[in-house]
Amino acid sequence: MGKKILLEHVNVPNIHTYEVYRSKGGYDSVEKALKMAPNDIVEEVKKSGLRGRGGAGFPTGMKWSFIDKKSGRPRHLVCNADESEPGTFKDRYLMEKLPHLLVEGMITSSIALEAHLSYIYIRGEYMWVYRILERAINEAYANGWLGKNIKGSGYDLDLHVTCGAGAYICGEETALIESLEGKRGNPRIKPPFPAVVGLYGNPTVVNNVETIMDIPWIVMNGGDEFAKIGIGKSTGTKLISASGNIKNPGVYEIELGITVEEFVMSDEWCGGMQTDRPLKACVPGGSSVPILPANLLFKTAKDETRLMTYESMADGGFATGSMIGSGGFIVYDDRQCIVRNTWNFSRFYHHESCGQCSPCREGTGWLEKVTWRLEHGYGNMEDIDLLWDIQRKIEGNTICPLGDAAAWPVAAAIRHFRHEFEYHVRYPEKVKDRKHFEAEPWEKVKHLMELLYLPILLDLVVLAQFCIMLFLNYKQKLCLFMF
């Protein structure tokens, strides 16, 4: 068994309650942090080599050091708990099982940043997790870990948990800030970065749930000890959400540096393939990263062993590599259709695009429509080249990375599995005869409705609703005037 930093006590009965969590050393890092200089905490995080666990992998200590301390404006820490990436569910698991560890991490990190008002922004669909966190925060207030003059230190901190409305785009830090301010969740143009102009125009740091939950261990044990775990610049442990055609799906905490083959095939982790079918492909970091075929999953293009690290997973660039991303590890056996998988992802990104940038708004729509045609036996060879052209025009031409996230899976699928796309063109009748196509006639209807200008019909419905609201409001005011 590897080192456990976050999940060491996860199976302790009632660990979600304050009393049990405190008995296991909970909130000790807050006591220690209150006696340390804030800059010393930041330096320990820098020494640790901790990288953001939300997907980008940016060094956390460096991100903290960017925060504006000269303006004199209030600073904020925001926890990004808007976990919406298909294939990723580790943050939900952490918040369900260890809510007080997140609260402790928020307090310790806020001390380091000298923030006095911090927020946890949680995904709209996680309402039960919202209630779990709210209870943990109330227990922290009741026991003197939040509020005025925490433990007689003179340090004040208020912590709030806020629920989003279910928009994937709000996982992007500036869109999250916009939503937290009560606005539409559209990403901002950067610069200025949130570390300078963030929440309410104040310096703000946005970190992922897992990132923040690593901080108490670093404060208690030191950055150097954390850096000893892992390999190279990939230090510490990482939570992986394993799913797909494997025997043991679930959330696993691994030491960065184990081999991908060990993670997939070992009984300690994924347990190998279901019914011992051949491995076909894997999405190693959530739906937004390039898919890897079986021949590039365990070995790199240089015939080196591929490791569960940021560097090894990206070896060869997107031509022969991928990203560890958010840790959404989806495994496919030989029964899975890559064209169908690509269509599913394209449909998701089209639905979740905020529409602010034309390349993303229009491009994701075309990606969905063209992949729909190919998946359902209505495509032609030109459609494959059209997909390639569309994704190239999206990538790098949008305000936020959602456009890139929509383009990369399509590019990788065509690069590694073009023969499957061509099969869908050459044998449309075989594609149409598949059971999953017959079971979903609504998808054909939906596609036809889109071609028949469904957006215009929806606009007319919204206009009608608006007119009804105006009429009812006028009627109510007229009644008040009469009486």
Question: What residue ranges belong to the model's regions?
Answer:
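Gly-rich Lys/Arg/Thr-decorated short loops/hinges at beta-loop-alpha junctions or inter-strand turns
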Residues: 21-26, 79-91, 194-199, 241-246
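Cofactor-/ligand-binding subdomain signature composed of acidic, glycine-rich
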Residues: 1-44
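Histidine-anchored nucleotide/phosphate-binding helix
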Residues: 98-112
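Conserved phosphate/anionic-ligand binding catalytic regions in large, soluble enzymes, centered on
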Residues: 47-65, 166-177, 350-362, 398-410
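Hydrophobic alpha-helical positions that pack around
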Residues: 130-256, 272-274, 432, 459, ...
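N-terminal glycine-rich phosphate/pyrophosphate-binding loops that anchor nucleotide-derived ligands
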Residues: 33-75
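Ferredoxin-type iron-sulfur electron-transfer modules in oxidoreductases and energy-metabolism complexes
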Residues: 28-44, 73-75, 81, 91-95, ...
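Short amphipathic, charge-patterned alpha-helical segments
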Residues: 105-107, 257-274
